[in-house]
Amino acid sequence: MTTNYSIDCNTGSMGNKYYIMVDKDNRDIRRELRKGMEEENKDWIISSSATGIRKGHSYVIAVSEQAVNDEKFLSILNKYDTQVKKFVWCYIRFEKPDGFRYWIPEEDAVKMKNELENNESIITVSIDYINDQ
């Protein structure tokens, strides 16, 4: 039996919209960013669920809007040929055709999560409200 789901995606209320990808073996850029934050007394890196996520051979690091507009921060990124990219936090709610919300079998949830995370534009997927029966 196949179950069809509709996806309601709400991106309007989420923050932390910028990130950089840093090669997992490149400690120099991370060290220089930490040093720059200390010297400038600024918070360029955001501690969040997106900070330090490993994606392939890189780490995804969320950065503040303040950082995106900071010349010193941008010069460090330029030195290491790294660019700031924009992302969207996306909350997905599954609804069954009968309108019942917040239900998805665990097997379907894991399959969708794996498929979504194989897309290079998607950083990470968290599944909530699964039916483990």
UniProtKB/Swiss-Prot annotation:
**Could you say which protein family the record assigns here?**
Belongs to the UPF0228 family.
Q: By what name is this protein known?
A: UPF0228 protein MM_0400
Q: Specify the superkingdom.
A: Archaea
User: What organism does the record attribute this protein to?
Assistant: Methanosarcina mazei (strain ATCC BAA-159 / DSM 3647 / Goe1 / Go1 / JCM 11833 / OCM 88) (Methanosarcina frisia)
